[in-house]
């Protein structure tokens, strides 16, 4: 029997939102998981507390020097049963990110148990509609109140929950417009591109805003050395379908190792598609398009799962992929992947982790 996590109960519970108007990241549940770290006693006081503001020092090192990492995963409900999707992979990546920023690693099993108990307490918040889920955001930041660049001796970990609606607002995938960034870079090898650190996202915002002003949804980043090889999209890994083969840039230390990316690769192979992980230059991609070999492009990530790319612009040239329609392989992967997530298709890989009732 797992040890129960201490719970500090609220006096009153929130009114739950209309599930037809959820959107993404707008509403938060009644409770959150809290965990503190001090250098002299390690991680301690794992507990579930009411969701609300927290108090930190104005000199908290995480605010000044950027020691802050996060994760994102989801829980799904079907016929009253709630299941997490590959949470072990998220906590492994969380520890990799923590190590890169010289932050203390967590006990993955202990944290997963705490998450299960939190989600069980909040299971009434898990929406059950088509494409809906409970978004889960674990994050860790430095809290020691002292100035001076150096690793903090104190940290706080929180996990907050947000009921979220269908990403596309309906059953049809909507192709996105992508702008290839050729001035700014996201990351370089030896840096923090492989880690899910807050600063990576802050550094991407200027290019993202510029792309939005030009009418594009997201930015496709090139490598930080030659600005020649494709790496990833702002919030997604990227895939290409050429002559029926599924291709994605190989992990090189500057690309985030997405859990959705990893799962899509495994799933595509299981479905009989040839999958190739390798370097892909932007010039090669456009040449493949000109030859009629590039038939589909899609991104993968926790929020959208799979997002087809309909338009791609690089320098002064814009191409339209598959007549701006979702490709056959893209749709197949999306249907099977989401079917496994929400429990309507068999989970042959053991990716779903059912949340017990404590």
Swiss-Prot record:
Keywords: Amino-acid biosynthesis, Aminotransferase, Branched-chain amino acid biosynthesis, Pyridoxal phosphate, Transferase. GO terms for molecular function: L-isoleucine-2-oxoglutarate transaminase activity; L-leucine-2-oxoglutarate transaminase activity; L-valine-2-oxoglutarate transaminase activity. Pathway: Amino-acid biosynthesis; L-isoleucine biosynthesis; L-isoleucine from 2-oxobutanoate: step 4/4; Amino-acid biosynthesis; L-leucine biosynthesis; L-leucine from 3-methyl-2-oxobutanoate: step 4/4; Amino-acid biosynthesis; L-valine biosynthesis; L-valine from pyruvate: step 4/4. It is an enzyme of class 2 (transferase). The keyword Nucleotide-binding does not apply. It catalyses: L-leucine + 2-oxoglutarate = 4-methyl-2-oxopentanoate + L-glutamate; L-isoleucine + 2-oxoglutarate = (S)-3-methyl-2-oxopentanoate + L-glutamate; L-valine + 2-oxoglutarate = 3-methyl-2-oxobutanoate + L-glutamate. The modification N6-(pyridoxal phosphate)lysine is found at residue 196. GO terms for biological process: isoleucine biosynthetic process; L-leucine biosynthetic process; L-valine biosynthetic process. Its cofactor is pyridoxal 5'-phosphate. Its EC number is 2.6.1.42. Acts on leucine, isoleucine and valine. PANTHER family: BRANCHED-CHAIN-AMINO-ACID AMINOTRANSFERASE, SUBGROUP IIII AMINOTRANSFERASE. Belongs to the class-IV pyridoxal-phosphate-dependent aminotransferase family. This is Probable branched-chain-amino-acid aminotransferase. It comes from Staphylococcus aureus (strain MRSA252).
């Amino acid at each position: 029997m797992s040890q129960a996590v201490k719970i500090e109960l609220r006096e009153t519970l929130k009114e739950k939102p209309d599930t037809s108007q959820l959107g993404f990241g707008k509403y938060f549940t009644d409770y959150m998981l809290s965990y503190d770290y001090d250098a002299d006693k390690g991680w301690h006081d794992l507990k579930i507390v009411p969701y609300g503001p927290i108090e930190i020092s104005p000199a908290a090192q995480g605010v000044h020097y950027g020691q802050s990492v996060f994760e994102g995963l989801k829980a799904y409900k079907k016929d009253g049963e709630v299941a997490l999707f590959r949470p072990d992979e998220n906590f492994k990546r969380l520890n990799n990110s923590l190590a890169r920023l010289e932050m203390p690693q967590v006990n993955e099993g202990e944290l997963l148990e705490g998450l299960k108990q939190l989600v069980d307490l909040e299971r009434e918040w898990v929406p059950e509609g088509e494409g809906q889920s409970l978004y889960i955001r674990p994050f860790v930041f430095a809290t020691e109140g002292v100035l001076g660049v150096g690793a903090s001796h104190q940290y706080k970990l929180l996990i907050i929950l947000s009921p979220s609606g269908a990403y596309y607002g309906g059953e049809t995938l909507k192709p996105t417009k992508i702008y290839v960034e050729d001035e700014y870079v996201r990351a370089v090898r030896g840096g923090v591109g492989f880690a899910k650190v807050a600063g990576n996202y802050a550094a991407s915002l200027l290019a993202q805003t510029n792309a939005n002003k030009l009418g594009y949804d997201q930015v496709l980043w090139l490598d930080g050395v030659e600005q020649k090889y494709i790496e990833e999209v702002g919030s997604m890994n990227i895939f290409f379908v050429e002559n029926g083969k599924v291709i994605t840039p190989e992990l090189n230390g500057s690309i985030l190792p997405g859990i959705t990316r990893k799962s899509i690769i495994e799933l595509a192979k299981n479905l009989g598609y040839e999958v190739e992980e390798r370097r892909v230059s932007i010039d090669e991609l456009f040449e493949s398009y000109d030859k009629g070999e590039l038939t589909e492009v899609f991104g993968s990530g926790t929020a959208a799962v799979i997002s087809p790319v309909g338009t791609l612009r690089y320098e002064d040239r814009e191409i339209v992929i598959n007549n701006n329609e979702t490709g056959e392989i893209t749709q197949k992967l999306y249907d099977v992947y989401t079917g496994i997530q929400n429990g309507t298709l068999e989970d042959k890989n053991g990716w779903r982790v059912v949340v017990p009732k404590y």
